[in-house]
Amino acid sequence: MEELTKLIIKWHHDRNLIEGSSDKDQVLKLMQELGELSDSVCKGKDVKDDLGDMMVVMLNIMERQGISMED
């Protein structure tokens, strides 16, 4: 999981999603992903991708705030 986390954070930096974005933008993205998760749950669909998308956005917010998974 640690290596995957590092790769996701690198992906964010490579696409300027840390310096070129804001916490507000990322929280709005997280809420969008939560809506997709809610829709999947209500429809009885698989939620693995929705949860993964939320984790990616949360890792972005954590990186912006200087918080690690160990914290």
Show where each model-derived region lies.
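Flexible "arm" and connector segments at domain edges
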Residues: 1-71
